[in-house]
Amino acid sequence: MDKRILKLRQQIDELDEEIILLLKKRMGISKEVGKLKEELDIPVEDKTRENEIIDRLTQQAGRNLSEEQLIRIFTAVFKSSKQIQHWVTTSKQTNIFW
């Protein structure tokens, strides 16, 4: 294998590790949001917030990430976050995924 490809793949692997750490951190915060939503009797689903996030991130994405790609990625992130929040609001357990 060409050394240049290996070097680039190594960079991708390092970024993947950073993404995992950030996703874990995001899901931990989502868990806390779920607890507060339960306490305040606020629904988990908040399409307005999701649209605000997509709009903000679309402006930041630039040329290497299309709006369609960004929406697909963050739809999955939102789905996972909402699953955690639903889990927190329907269960008294507090140890999910970590």
Q: How would you describe each model-predicted region?
A:
Residues M1-W98:
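Domain-level signature for soluble enzymes in the chorismate/prephenate branch of the shikimate pathway
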